[in-house]
Design a protein with these regions (language model features):
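C-terminal helix-loop subdomains that flank or include functional centers
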Residues: 291, 295-309, 326-330, 334-482
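Short glycine/proline-rich turn/loop motifs
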Residues: 93, 101-105, 313-322, 448-449
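Extended, helix-rich architectural segments
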Residues: 1-147, 471-482
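Short secondary-structure junctions and interdomain/linker hinges
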Residues: 37, 41, 124, 132-139, ...
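Glycine- and charge-rich intrinsically disordered segments
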Residues: 1-3, 255-271, 281-287, 451-482
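Extended, regular secondary-structure scaffolds
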Residues: 129-241
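Extended, charged amphipathic alpha-helical segments
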Residues: 218-356, 363
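Generic detection of long, well-ordered alpha-helical segments
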Residues: 114-122, 130, 246-256, 329, ...
Length: 482
């Protein structure tokens, strides 16, 4: 039995438990879950939001101009211009917010943490941030030694009815409608792969296996699985956009539609109004066919007979129509300003002048800072969940990407140099110049120069070296091939 959640009738973790271990019943449950998920409001919002993110507008694309005949019957307007111009503002806003928070990567207190999370951790975090802002939620799967990210449109979450925790989920994908449907059921005690080919029932592709597999290889037996284990909790963590997990487009979609519709109407008016029409004089006895023939002759021969002296012959005078522009332009400018306010986006044109002070620039970032502060809390909660699964005790921090007055910021750092150590000053100056990723290489070169000075001058005082020890890591395992 389905239960209501946030306006959608979705299946829950308790529904999965009620199915039991019968594979036929579990496959029916998976098929039903996917169908209900694709028909849910959250899925439809995510699908539309992805189109807005890509620079399309599904609302105006579905809109058709209608005209009515003398009997009052509606017909599709096939005559007037119907340009449909979509803006990319939503995509710009999402990319700006993600880049602002995660553009410089995630920093940890222990340098070894990044290595244990995998080389692509920062890239996966950027992907997760985009998915979460677009659809309202994304899902991160810790797969032994690296992070994998699922979007809402490919993952059915199964929440616990009692505490709201994510306890199971179904990832599904299908290249085309006539291609096989693949699905993976993730549970606390392992995962199972399924496949549903065209015209066939769903079958088990791979039996349930634990998430961490221990492998051994020998010449006689080759590679074999000799042991397996699971994580202390469900290995998929949701990244929500706020407590309600709402798309960033929620509440602002109508304004985006208004801007796109207004822009489209202006182009349509120009298309329709940028015409030359003819005023025919002394043609009262001519019908529509005569008018067309007369104008065709004027266009081809460029001659119009006006009659003899005192005789009022037929004449043709060309005129033009100018489309209204100023009023529409003012409306478009107003809607753009409203979008920046509603989305709390940073408008770089406000600080485009080269003489902006650091205080003025910082003030321009206030709306974006307020919005990103909320999203940062969600990102931090997500990362802490991943760290717990990986068995890492650490905390993340972030360096936000800002437009700054470099000379003023540099002077501020150097004025306080007596109160900071070399490491802090070096990191700050590199960050200001956009070279924060060069810190490790710079420190290696400085250490090499230090050693060279010591070798050339034996009396030069050497710095004490402290031995750093690291905890031993667990034995090798095999990641899930999801």
């Amino acid at each position: 039995m389905s239960r209501c959640g946030r306006g959608d009738f979705l299946l829950t973790y308790q529904d999965l438990l009620a199915v039991g271990e019968d594979e036929k019943a579990r496959m029916d449950f998976i098929w039903r879950s996917i169908n209900e998920h694709e028909g849910s409001k959250a899925y439809q919002v995510a699908a539309d939001a992805e189109l807005y993110f890509k620079g399309e507008n599904p609302t105006i694309n579905r809109y058709e101009k209608i005209i009515y005949d003398m009997q009052g019957r509606a017909h599709k307007d096939m005559y007037t211009a119907n340009h449909k111009i979509a803006s990319s503002f939503f995509g710009f806003d999402v990319r700006q917010e993600v880049s602002y928070l995660l553009g410089n990567g995630v920093t940890f207190q222990d340098d070894a943490t990044k290595d244990r999370l995998g080389k692509k951790f920062d890239l996966e975090m950027v992907r997760a941030g985009k998915y979460a802002l677009v659809a309202g939620v994304a899902f991160g799967f810790w797969n032994l030694d690296h992070l994998e990210v699922f979007k809402l449109r490919e993952f059915v979450p199964l929440y616990d009815e009692e505490n709201g925790a994510l306890m199971a989920g179904i990832r599904f994908w299908q290249v085309e409608k006539d291609k096989p449907l693949r699905a993976t059921l993730y549970e606390v005690d392992g995962y199972t792969d399924y496949i549903r080919r065209k015209g066939e029932d769903m079958t088990v592709l791979k039996e349930k296996r634990p998430y961490v597999l221990r492998l051994r290889t020998s010449q006689a037996d080759g590679t074999e699985i000799y042991d397996g284990q699971n994580y202390p909790s469900f290995p998929i963590v949701p990244l929500k956009n706020g407590d309600d997990a709402l798309s960033e487009l929620t509440g602002k979609r109508n304004t985006v539609d208004a801007l796109d519709l207004c822009t489209s109407n202006m182009v349509n008016n120009v298309d329709e109004g940028n015409l030359i029409y003819w005023v025919l004089t002394n043609c009262g006895g001519m019908d529509d066919l005569d008018d067309s023939k007369f104008l065709d002759k004027v266009r081809t021969s460029h001659i119009a007979h006006a009659g003899s002296d005192g005789d009022e012959g037929a004449t043709a005078e060309p005129r033009t129509i100018e489309a209204p522009f100023q009023g529409t332009e003012a409306t478009i400018d107003m809607l753009k300003r409203k979008l920046y306010e509603d989305f709390q986006a940073f408008d770089s044109s406000a600080v485009s002048a080269g003489n902006q002070t650091a205080t003025a620039i910082a003030a321009s970032y206030t709306p974006l800072d307020l919005k990103v502060d909320d999203f940062e809390a969600s990102v931090t909660e997500f990362i802490l969940g991943i760290l717990a699964l990986a068995g890492i005790d650490d905390e993340p921090s972030y360096t936000r990407s800002k437009i700054i007055n470099k000379s003023e910021e540099t002077q501020t750092i150097l004025m306080g140099a007596d109160y900071y150590d070399d490491e802090y000053i070096t990191k700050k100056l590199l960050t200001i110049n956009g070279d924060a990723d060069q810190y490790d290489e710079l420190m290696k070169r400085k250490q090499a120069e230090e050693m060279e000075r010591v070798e050339q001058n034996p009396d030069f005082p050497q710095q004490e070296e402290n031995e750093v020890t690291e905890d031993g890591e667990t034995g090798p395992g095999a990641p899930v091939d999801g």
